[in-house]
Amino acid sequence: MASSSSVSVFDNYRFRTAFNEELYNITVKNKKVISEVCFNLNDDEYPEIREQIALRGWRRLAAPTTEISKMLIHEFYANAIITEEEREEHGGHLYMSFVRGVPVNFSPENIRRVMQFKAEVEGARTNFETRKAHDQQLDNVLAELCMPGATWKLSTGQQRSEIPVIRAILIHCIMKGEDVRAEEIIADKIIRTAQGIKEKGKLGFSSTIYKLCNDAGVPLREFRKTKKIPTETPITARRLESTRLPRNPQH
């Protein structure tokens, strides 16, 4: 008499476990994927923004790769999800995914190396994480980022024309030359997105993930004929002016 096997059958080339494959099929593969937005500024436009990009080593972040496979990003996020048992076993989150048989490290340290971020900003006065948690300085944020003479309201709205509080603090820190560790922000956001995969939301940082996969040796040729992620509208001087974000005031 034939006996039934208790071993789950799954595609172990594409997925870490049967659990990850199931989440991919049920939820992840239907998620919208977005890329980082490219900065497209001429040499005489917003020099303070271009200066901050160069100072922080964010050139690769500000000029994202295009023509990225949506399936690649879906598989990356599906395999970044871990169970509660795995979290307890390893004492926290794992900064590791798996794409087409290849482990992909998305730890802050590896993101900084692959993206060529500078380790810190010379002469930085404070840190974004400290500001976010303990010293938001919202009066300064409003005074220096918002247009004079307008009435402003802090909200948690998610409209594209609105800036959430945390993002406003991030922009303020960047423009003031304070320490912003982009690698930690990206790694943390990937973790939170993966662990909250059943919630509404989009899958981001596709260009960074593509570069991590390429560095790890993922066979990207296998994704050549798959559907690509739409390119985001670049940030231009005209777009900055239309959103009424002023330049950083001089002191």
Predicted regions and their residues:
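A structural signal for long, well-ordered, hydrophobic/aromatic- and basic-residue-enriched core segments
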Residues: 1-251
